[in-house]
Amino acid sequence: MDEEIAALVVDNGSGMCKAGFAGDDAPRAVFPSIVGRPRHQGVMVGMGQKDSYVGDEAQSKRGILTLKYPIEHGIVTNWDDMEKIWHHTFYNELRVAPEEHPVLLTEAPLNPKANREKMTQIMFETFNTPAMYVAIQAVLSLYASGRTTGIVMDSGDGVTHTVPIYEGYALPHAILRLDLAGRDLTDYLMKILTERGYSFTTTAEREIVRDIKEKLCYVALDFEQEMGTAASSSSLEKSYELPDGQVITIGNERFRCPEALFQPSFLGMESCGIHETTFNSIMKCDVDIRKDLYANTVLSGGTTMYPGIADRMQKEITSLAPSTMKIKIIAPPERKYSVWIGGSILASLSTFQQMWISKQEYDESGPSIVHRKCF
């Protein structure tokens, strides 16, 4: 596709926004889904201080800002801020005029209907896009892995879903949602580091802890055994340098943090872990397709990037499933962006072109058109 008329693909995650052009193999812009507002009144006259900052700029000025995430648990909760993020995406990151390109947006499975209507309305009325479409994130991840049947365990910053998909259609009755994801793990790491005597409290310091989590955490194959190793030797300890030069050491926190994915009771939650949720999702499906789901379990999203997570999933699901069942966990290396990549593939298919909701259709039917055209 020509870049002149290429569709724009925007994957709005709770933690990061991924945006770019359909047909590309990776998003051009990846920035935090945050809007920051100054905590203090400006004293320097003529400094040209803005009333809000978006993305990386908010991140770099985080010391003087209050940071807010407009998407919580995968669902947009603050539309004014969301509009700022989209504006920033089009005009500052991609540097395109949205009125010249069709836009493919993504949404969480089981998203409230009003949510996708509002997205549709903003695209057509605020940004005047010629056409748009809303696709379900997990389905796009499956496309990106080159499959049309499988179960996707998609875990990002705000929410985790297990979505069984058969021949390209998500099976809504079997989708399970777990409000436990990256942000909760960051908060948990903040808590267990506090027990070590390090204090992280502000929204800005939370970002430092997120970095520690991404660089040093991993999933243990056998949690109890790993705890034993950590207690008896210092082989698992790693050090991390804080922005002020102070060095902190972390040991069993490295695997205690993501262990909460398998044991949500660590966070005081009563829900099942990701392995059991995946299994329960499969069990809600027709008995004839379960075999295909077990053999095509695809991991997607940033929270599945921990080293060791695929082996642990394999071990846990094997112990839950029938003993003769072949179980395969697929963890594509680019899974952090697989939702975006799937969107890029979908929006550049010739067969998809008649699926777009056009401005004309929107003007005739209103926002509810999105339920008829996007499934």
From Swiss-Prot:
Sites of Methionine (R)-sulfoxide modification: 44, 47
Keyword list (alphabetical) reads: Acetylation, ATP-binding, Cytoplasm, Cytoskeleton, Hydrolase, Methylation, Nucleotide-binding, Nucleus, Oxidation
Q: Which CDD domains match?
A: ASKHA_NBD_actin
Q: Entry's Pfam families?
A: Actin
> Where expressed (tissue)?
Skeletal muscle, heart, gill, digestive tissue and brain. Widespread expression throughout the brain, with highest levels in regions where neuronal proliferation is greatest.
Q: GO cellular-component terms in the record?
A: actin cytoskeleton; actin filament; cytoskeleton; dense body; focal adhesion; nucleus; plasma membrane
The entry's protein name is Actin, cytoplasmic 1
Modifications made to the protein after synthesis: Oxidation of Met-44 and Met-47 by MICALs (mical1, mical2 or mical3) to form methionine sulfoxide promotes actin filament depolymerization. Mical1 and mical2 produce the (R)-S-oxide form. The (R)-S-oxide form is reverted by msrb1 and msrb2, which promote actin repolymerization. Methylation at His-73 by SETD3. Methylation stabilizes actin filaments.
According to the UniProt record, list the residues that bear N-acetylmethionine.
1
Instruction: Provide the gene name from the record.
Output: actba
Localization per Swiss-Prot or TrEMBL: Cytoplasm, Cytoskeleton; Nucleus
N-acetylaspartate PTM positions read 2
Q: Which reaction does it catalyse?
A: ATP + H2O = ADP + phosphate + H(+)
Extra info from the record? In vertebrates 3 main groups of actin isoforms, alpha, beta and gamma have been identified. The alpha actins are found in muscle tissues and are a major constituent of the contractile apparatus. The beta and gamma actins coexist in most cell types as components of the cytoskeleton and as mediators of internal cell motility.
Q: Which PANTHER family match?
A: ACTIN
Concerning its family, UniProt says: Belongs to the actin family.
Q: What is its EC number?
A: 3.6.4.-
Q: Which residues carry this modification: Tele-methylhistidine?
A: 73
Q: Extract the PROSITE patterns matched here.
A: ACTINS_1 (PS00406), ACTINS_2 (PS00432), ACTINS_ACT_LIKE (PS01132)
